[in-house]
Amino acid sequence: MSETAKKVIVGMSGGVDSSVSAWLLQQQGYQVEGLFMKNWEEDDGEEYCTAAADLADAQAVCDKLGIELHTVNFAAEYWDNVFELFLAEYKAGRTPNPDILCNKEIKFKAFLEFAAEDLCADYIATGHYVRRAXVDGKSRLLRGLDSNKDQSYFLYTLSHEQIAQSLFPVGELEKPQVRKIAEDLGLVTAKKKDSTGICFIGERKFRKFLGRYLPAQPGKIITVDGDEIGEHQGLMYHTLGQRKGLGIGGTKDGTEEPWYVVDKDVENNILIVAQGHEHPRLMSVGLIAQQLHWVDREPFTGTMRCTVKTRYRQTDIPCTVKALDADRIEVIFDEPVAAVTPGQSAVFYNGEVCLGGGIIEQRLPLPV
């Protein structure tokens, strides 16, 4: 079988990126089929029923392109492998990233296995803005060509074997080009806005949604000087560096600086705040990361120089990484960084290549 006749299953989300991905693969000569994944059981009425609309859009695109659309329900896998861990992290006072977990457990595990075993696919494809390239005989993950849309941060858990079985057609394009292709083709998704919110759970009100699964525990808001200035409705609703939603307007000592979350005392259910987004308590000189995933799957020992992102869309931070043991590293930044958040991911790069990453276990605060 020639390379161009190979079978690709495209994860069709009902969005513009996966729609255009399917068309691009058709142009490249692949045998293309679509798969719509239902990963959440809707139980709260019409207001949040986005899955049905997304499925209708995915079906309309597949009809237009003349390709078959399969559907699969991964709700049980999502609940067990993504959502329960997501809740446990919030309960522990950390701020997890469910999109990274979802890519790891659903899109590049459950989907990959289903496509290969049930649909006899040679590859899967998604609408992620990343690229792949072979380096030293292994498939590597590269940043997407569109630096504004690069999604390699969310895919750092992938192994070189998973990347070798995955295609990322829009990673070579910029977003406006993708929308233009969709418009020229007359696809219903051409002007559909990009999805935000929790992976697969959609745009629902986050605080209300989380409150259904984790009972909120109100507690004190205390300044770094120890003054009590308000009450929070639950530590889980707040993250380091947060400014909005604290409900403690006004100023102190005549300064006009707004209040920011600088720490959480989980044991005592206290939210600690300070004024100014560059307050020393918000700054870190480094971090400790665990649950490491290196794309080449080679164990990391010794030290290395590279860059790191501690959150999506952050400018790369030059740093030195040192192995502490098989599954923990210490990262020291060249310059202090604000709002390094336990539970989020630290993702490492060498130029365009995403090396891998890990979960931030603790931040190393600026010495006082």
UniProtKB/Swiss-Prot annotation:
The record marks 128, 344 as: Interaction with tRNA. GO terms for molecular function: ATP binding; tRNA binding; tRNA-uridine 2-sulfurtransferase activity. Its main location: cytoplasm. The active site is at 102 (nucleophile), 199 (cysteine persulfide intermediate). GO terms for biological process: tRNA wobble position uridine thiolation. Disulfide bonds join 102-199. Pfam families: tRNA_Me_trans, tRNA_Me_trans_C, tRNA_Me_trans_M. Residues 97-99 are annotated as: Interaction with target base in tRNA. Keywords: ATP-binding, Cytoplasm, Disulfide bond, Nucleotide-binding, RNA-binding, Transferase, tRNA processing, tRNA-binding. It catalyses: S-sulfanyl-L-cysteinyl-[protein] + uridine(34) in tRNA + AH2 + ATP = 2-thiouridine(34) in tRNA + L-cysteinyl-[protein] + A + AMP + diphosphate + H(+). It is an enzyme of class 2 (transferase). ATP binds at residues 11-18, 37, 127. One of its GO terms (cellular component) is cytoplasm. Its EC number is 2.8.1.13. Residues 149-151, 311-312 are annotated as: Interaction with tRNA. It is found in: Cytoplasm. CDD domains: MnmA_TRMU-like (cd01998). Belongs to the MnmA/TRMU family. Interacts with TusE. HAMAP family: tRNA_thiouridyl_MnmA. Catalyzes the 2-thiolation of uridine at the wobble position (U34) of tRNA(Lys), tRNA(Glu) and tRNA(Gln), leading to the formation of s(2)U34, the first step of tRNA-mnm(5)s(2)U34 synthesis. Sulfur is provided by IscS, via a sulfur-relay system. Binds ATP and its substrate tRNAs. This is tRNA-specific 2-thiouridylase MnmA.
